Design a protein with these regions (language model features):
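Short, low-complexity, charge-dense intrinsically disordered segments
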Residues: 3-19, 24-27
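Globin-like tetrapyrrole-binding proteins
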Residues: 934
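Active-site histidine-acidic residue metal-binding/catalytic motifs
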Residues: 59-63, 68, 149, 195, ...
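Solvent-exposed helix-loop boundary motif
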Residues: 43, 59-165, 174-224, 240, ...
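Short, well-ordered beta-strand segments
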Residues: 166-171, 774-775
Length: 948
């Protein structure tokens, strides 16, 4: 075989990326380390027809784009004179970086207290730290500007420095008269009045021009922000693009050919609504959106210690609870209550025969997601860490707040007292008492119903009966073997041999022992049973095959319903504030309660005495965070960015919402209409905002003399909308104001599931134990179970058809992650994931070019095309339809056919003897392999990996 020359210009001219891909299959791996080859790979991944490129960005940004982004990210001009105050603008910076040494401790570094302007002016050991109006004369500014303070590598940002310098220059103003003692005011009015802590209020719908009267509420709010900035909506995405987008968004799968043709044939005004209704009714909706929730829940099927990452074999029951809840459109308020306190919704004792009881207990698996290594390393510190991680998961997923900072001291950024943290912890401590701890194995709940137990017992009896029959026949056969060996001895010793072998070993005489040593093949029946392979290998194999029937019978058993859940012991649990977060140093006792900053805006409607009270308090419709946070999460997964871009941090250190009125309107609307998430999805995906194009279509141009502001609300002004897209791209490069759709890369699971779908392999069955992932001999995570022989690795038993199940159903063990999923940013749950990365890195391209699983899927797809169409043009058309939900352009068709033929030609010339023999038997094999090359190139393209 010819070697692939990575640096040869002639080589790269002769061979496209597909040739390199397929050559690598035959040569084990092509040499792809040279920069030139890597550049070729990255460029060729998206080489299918620039003419068909609908605004799809390639891996590298253009210099103009980079310049635009830098301009947008640059620090704004100095604030207007007198506009800065200490409490609002400066104190948060100093609190984050300086208060630990200069304020919070009884002994302050340099005797300098930075918590009050008055004390900065008074100064410390080095004199006055602040001279209002004169930054150059202010010691605090000099230390910051010279990078002397704060100590360590983390310094103030340029923007923070600008704020402090401008504030001093403006006179070091305060918002109000300062208190005499800074300890009296642990948080300011500005911190307590942060937007996210204020109650949700339903805003009025913005006014729009007469031409925009058709706009839905979402679009009115978006239009209002666009109009303020002289921007407008972009053109609508074409129907195929919209269908692919919404199908992936709601189910995580590509649309089928039938779904595409049905939608294109439906010319009614309700065509899109019918599509959305169908997708929301699909069981695959629950699979897709469960993945998003499981990210924030920190879902994992192992305990988390690297060396002893013990599996959680029953955790999949919680995963199935989430899928079922979402498919059933369980109202979000109920969803939260069940996960926080489902066990308390049951009248004791729980009845295993009541499926509702089992479901409610399974829901509390939410509180069992945090790492817990106490099974093998049960220390107070590890117990405490599990509780802390659980609290972090609860607060970030439901409240959108990071409370962990308040374990040791008042929160660095948000108005959360250390006492607040331990009050919140006291809500959950009865199920996780660190001084009455139960290890993971001691917290399993068996909810197996009587019918299942009876069925299991009957099947076990059947298996035992068959096993006994096999054992009896095997012993009879071994008795025959024993007698054969005795008969092979001289007649004079046969009876003594029989007497010796029937005598228990400890009772044998020396003469009997000597006799048996002379005839080593004469053994007890038990010995021969164990060593039958040495006496009669054929019989040994026959009995092994019969025992497979026993295993098959046992495989019919319905599964025990064992749940990883929580429950309260009933014993009182006292909670304390830990000094500096140390569980060995408990301080003042505390009772369960809400964060004080939230209570300051509205008191709980009833006392919070435990988990159920707290869960009901969160979901009573008046909480300022719960509805906002879930609305933002749903928006995030439809647009690639939330209205708040820090979905797990709605606090002062997070970003403010780009569209606060829209966020509040949607949050209020969610509560008003019963917390139904499917209704929220409909509102979003049927909006004009969601339906915009992500880029200009081929041949689009901006008409001369037209601007985006001519008629920004008009649904028919396509030329104007195209101009609006350019306006939005140039003036809003981050798409904060939603003047176009954001291009989004598919996440890891959607990529794998889509490859399985288009190659006609996907198994869409729901529920059940996770498909095993194991470490092979090379240390790589693969689908299947390890097979051991005498304690040593003997291979991987594949998962069969289950290997093609959706990625949600693969084992989620922390230390074993499939290479494909990990390469495309499958998150680590430490302790959970608020926002996934969407990286673009070289290993992704190399994996899609060389991974054996991807190559096999490409071949499976080629076989599907081969049987699905006869003409080459139709096969290429079907490939594009499956991969991109659209037919190829004329140029793409020509390029693809030519590429396919070049690939087939190359395969016809391979000299490998086995391959030559296959070609003689199957003359079309080379063409099929060439088609597989084309399929792999489509899979590796940006158009497949991204949603437009």
């Amino acid at each position: 075989m010819n070697r692939v020359d990575a640096d040869s210009t002639d080589s790269t001219k002769r061979r496209g990326i597909g040739e390199i891909i397929m050559l690598s299959r035959f040569s084990c791996r092509a040499l792809l380390t040279a920069t030139s080859t890597l550049a070729l790979a990255l460029a060729a991944v998206d080489r299918i027809s620039p003419a068909g490129h609908s605004g799809l960005r390639t891996f590298a940004a253009s210099p103009a784009d980079v310049a635009l982004d830098r301009t947008a990210a640059s620090v704004s001009d100095e604030p207007a004179a007198g506009s800065l105050t200490f409490e609002k603008d400066v104190r948060p910076i100093l609190k984050t970086h300086c208060f630990l040494c200069h304020g919070e401790e009884p002994e302050k570094a340099g005797e300098l207290d930075l918590r009050l302007v008055r004390r900065m002016v008074a100064g410390g050991d080095s004199g006055a730290a602040l001279v209002p109006g004169e930054p150059d004369a202010s010691l605090v500014w000099h230390r910051i500007d010279d990078d002397e303070m704060p100590p360590g590598p983390k310094k103030l940002s340029d923007q923070e420095r600008t704020v402090i310098s401008a504030w001093i220059r403006q006179g070091a103003n305060t918002a109000r008269e300062e208190p005499l003692d800074p300890d009296e005011v642990r948080f300011t009015e500005e911190e307590r009045g942060h937007w996210a802590f204020r109650p949700v209020t339903r805003p009025e719908l913005p006014a729009v021009p007469e031409t925009g009267r058709h706009l839905a509420p979402i679009d009115r709010f978006v239009y209002d922000k666009l109009h303020e900035r002289g921007l407008a909506f972009s053109a609508a995405a074409d129907r195929r693009t919209w269908l692919r987008r919404v199908t992936f968004d709601l189910t995580g799968l590509p649309p089928t050919r039938e779904e595409i043709s049905d939608f294109l044939a439906d010319g009614s005004a309700d065509a899109k609504r019918r599509v959305v209704d169908r997708l929301l009714q699909s069981p695959q909706y629950g699979v897709r959106w469960a993945r998003h929730w499981l990210d924030v829940a920190g879902y994992a099927e192992s305990e988390g210690q690297v060396e002893k990452d013990r599996p959680r074999p029953h955790m999949w029951r919680y995963r199935d609870y989430v899928v079922d809840a979402l498919n059933g459109d369980l109202p979000y308020d109920r969803f939260v209550v069940e996960q926080l306190a489902g066990d308390l919704l049951i009248d004791d004792p729980a009845d295993p025969n009541d499926d509702r009881h089992a479901r409610l207990i399974a829901a509390t698996g939410f509180l069992r997601q945090a790492r817990d290594i106490t099974q093998t390393d049960d220390t107070l510190a590890n117990r405490n860490q599990t509780v802390a991680d659980t609290l972090d998961i609860v607060s970030s997923s439901i409240l959108g707040l990071t409370v962990a900072c308040a374990q040791c001291h008042d929160h660095r950024y948000d108005p959360i007292l250390i006492e607040d943290y331990y009050r919140l912890r006291a809500v959950f401590e009865p199920v996780m008492p660190i001084r009455q701890w139960r290890k993971p194995s001691e917290r399993l709940v068996d909810m197996t119903d009587d019918a299942t137990r009876a069925a299991r017992a009957a099947i076990e009896a059947e298996a035992v009966a068959l096993q006994q029959e096999i054992n009896d026949r095997r012993r009879a056969h071994c008795k025959t073997i024993q007698e054969r060996e005795i008969e092979a001895a001289p007649e004079a010793v046969r009876d003594p041999l029989r007497q010796a072998i029937d005598t228990p070993p400890k009772e044998r005489t020396p003469a009997q022992t000597t006799l048996l040593d002379r005839y080593p093949k004469v053994r007890t029946i038990d010995w021969i049973v164990g060593q039958l392979v040495e006496y009669d290998n054929a019989a040994h194999r026959r009995f092994q095959e019969e025992e497979k029937q026993v295993a098959a019978i046992r495989d019919r058993k319905p599964l025990d319903r064992v749940l990883m859940a929580v429950g309260e012991s009933g014993s009182p649990v006292e909670s304390h504030v830990f000094f500096r977060g140390d569980p060995e140093s408990p301080g003042e006792p505390v009772g369960p309660g809400e964060l004080s900053v939230l209570v300051s805006h509205r008191a709980p409607r009833s006392a919070i005495e435990g988990r159920l009270d707290y869960a009901r308090h969160l979901t009573d419709g008046a909480h300022p965070l719960v509805a906002r946070v879930i609305v933002n999460r749903v928006w995030l997964h439809h647009f690639g960015q939330g209205l708040v871009r820090t979905p797990g941090d709605f606090g002062l250190n997070g970003e403010r919402p780009t569209h606060p009125e829209l966020l509040d309107w949607l949050a209020d609307d969610l509560v008003r209409h019963g917390w139904g998430l499917k209704r929220l999805h409909r509102q979003i995906v049927l909006s004009r905002t969601y339906g915009q194009a992500s880029g200009l279509a081929p041949g689009d141009r901006v008409p001369a003399g037209r601007s985006a502001s001519d008629d920004p609300a008009s649904p028919t002004g396509d030329e104007v909308a195209r101009a609006a897209w350019l306006d939005s791209r140039q003036r809003d490069p981050e798409n904060r104001w939603l003047g176009r759709m954001t291009l989004r890369r598919l996440d890891a699971e959607a990529i794998r599931d889509a490859i399985l779908a288009i190659s006609d392999q996907l198994d869409v069955q729901l529920s059940g134990p996770s498909v095993a992932i194991s470490e092979d001999q090379e240390g790589k995570a693969v689908i299947g179970s390890r097979r051991l022989r005498d304690g040593l690795f003997a291979g991987i038993d594949g998962a069969g058809r289950e290997a093609a199940r959706r990625s949600l159903y693969l084992s989620a063990q922390r230390s074993l992650r499939l290479e494909l999923l990990q390469t495309f940013d499958l998150p680590e749950m430490v302790p959970n994931c608020q926002l996934r990365d969407a990286s673009t890195v070289t290993p992704q391209a190399l994996l899609l070019m060389n991974d054996g699983w991807v190559v096999n899927a490409s071949e499976q797809m080629a076989r599907r095309l081969w049987s699905g169409a006869d003409a080459a043009e139709d096969r290429v058309g079907l490939a594009f339809e499956l991969a991109f939900a659209r037919p190829p352009t004329a140029e793409e068709l020509d390029d693809s056919l030519a590429f396919w033929e070049r690939q087939a030609d190359m395969f016809r010339q391979f000299s490998d003897p086995d391959w030559r023999e296959q070609l003689r038997e199957q003359p079309g094999a080379a063409s099929l392999r060439g088609l597989a090359s084309l399929c792999q190139m489509l899979i590796a393209s940006n158009r497949f990996l991204y949603l437009e």
